[in-house]
UniProtKB/Swiss-Prot annotation:
Transmembrane segments: 20-40, 59-79
Protein name, entry field: Putative transmembrane protein ORF159
The keyword Membrane is annotated on this UniProt entry: yes
Coiled-coil segments on the chain, per record: none
Keywords: Host membrane, Membrane, Transmembrane, Transmembrane helix
UniProt membrane topology term: Multi-pass membrane protein
Motif Cell attachment site: where in chain: 106-108
GO CC annotations on file: host cell membrane; membrane
UniProt subcellular location: Host membrane
């Protein structure tokens, strides 16, 4: 029995977490309609990440932390602005939570890192629900899916 020329055996090549996070965040940015602002916030998050990490050779940790900062800044600036919250309040909260999540990745002992975990979850849920309330139909569904998906990587980090 011959196999067709177009046949290719399935290869198990999972997506890298960073690429998956970036895809989800770009989708979220597109839904919010603030892609330039999100990319700008990503640059800020990357700068903060590199500043906080002592071992710059740990590329994976820096990459993951950059993605975390990306999510936090997108939530802080984009979703809070969409829901009508003061931008300065959202940015301050974002910076505080970003520092807490970076502490988790650096392995700092509690209570510094653990303190921010419930705040971070509540912050993201508040932003997602506020954004969903301001949308309708398919956009609300996509927003709900995207926000829920962006929370999944943190369940293993926080626990």
């Amino acid at each position: 029995m011959t196999t067709p020329l177009c046949y290719s055996s399935p290869v198990n090549t999972p997506l890298s977490p960073s690429l998956l996070l970036l895809s989800l965040l770009l989708l979220l940015s597109t839904i919010c309609g603030v892609l330039p602002l999100s990319l700008f916030c990503c640059g800020i998050g990357t700068g903060i990440t590199l500043f906080n990490f002592d071992d710059t050779s740990d590329i994976i940790a820096v990459d993951i932390a950059s993605a975390i900062c990306f999510i936090i800044f997108c939530n802080g600036f984009c979703c809070c602005c969409c829901s009508g919250d003061p931008p300065y309040a959202s940015s301050t909260t974002s910076l505080a939570i970003c520092d807490g999540m970076l502490s988790l990745l650096r392995g700092d002992p509690p209570p510094v890192a653990v303190t921010y975990a419930p705040i971070f979850i509540a912050f993201c849920m508040h932003n997602s629900m506020s954004l969903i309330e301001s949308k309708s139909g398919l956009t609300a569904f996509l927003t709900r899916v995207t926000m829920t998906s962006s929370m999944l990587p943190f369940s293993s980090i926080i626990s």
